Amino acid sequence: MFNAGNWLLLIFTGCMVLIINGCSTGSWRESSRESAQIAPNPTITREAVIHVYSADAWGWRGLFAVHTWISVKPSNADSYTVLEVIGWRERHGLPVLRIEEDIPDRYWFGSKPELILEKRGEGVDELIDKIIEASQYYPWANTYKVFPGPNSNTFPAWIALKVPELKLELPFRAFGSGWAE
């Protein structure tokens, strides 16, 4: 029969197993950042595309939280622009908000992204313009705090508030998304 001490040991052991399994044995530097092959090829797909992705955070944080980002491709563009917040940039004196031409659907340091929103075709160019315009006024472009925010999930949540016709809903595990409200 289990007594209180045995229950505590069982709970502690279970938590340790979860944490250990959530921690990668490798370095984030060695983790995949390749395309997950979710986004349509921009040289073939001529229509406008908006994708919002979510992927488990790095290491043990991935047990609880996700990283979210936005990728856009205007009509007839040959590449995607990725809009995301990356916290380590702050330590290097860079804005945490990164808006650059990049692979739209990269693995997030080993975690395969999940497509949480897709908009394509007619009217999407106008939405892209609104996203880009709103991003210029993001109030925390140089500020990052893992918890409670502002963090990587605050930016897409803020865009969702500024561009409501996007109809973006972030996953429950997007901690920091409430900071934008």
Predicted regions and their residues:
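Activation targets extended, charge/polar-rich intrinsically disordered C-terminal tails
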Residues: 24-36, 132-181
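A cross-kingdom signal targeting lumenal/periplasmic-facing segments of multi-pass membrane
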Residues: 101-135, 139-142, 159, 163
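N-terminal Sec-pathway targeting helices
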Residues: 1-12
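Glycine-rich catalytic cores of cysteine/serine-nucleophile enzymes that process amide/ester linkages
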Residues: 26-39, 43-118
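C-terminal motif of bacterial Sec signal peptides marking the signal peptidase cleavage site
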Residues: 19-22
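Soluble non-cytosolic domains of exported or imported proteins
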Residues: 63, 118-125, 146-151
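A general structural-boundary detector
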Residues: 10, 56, 142-143
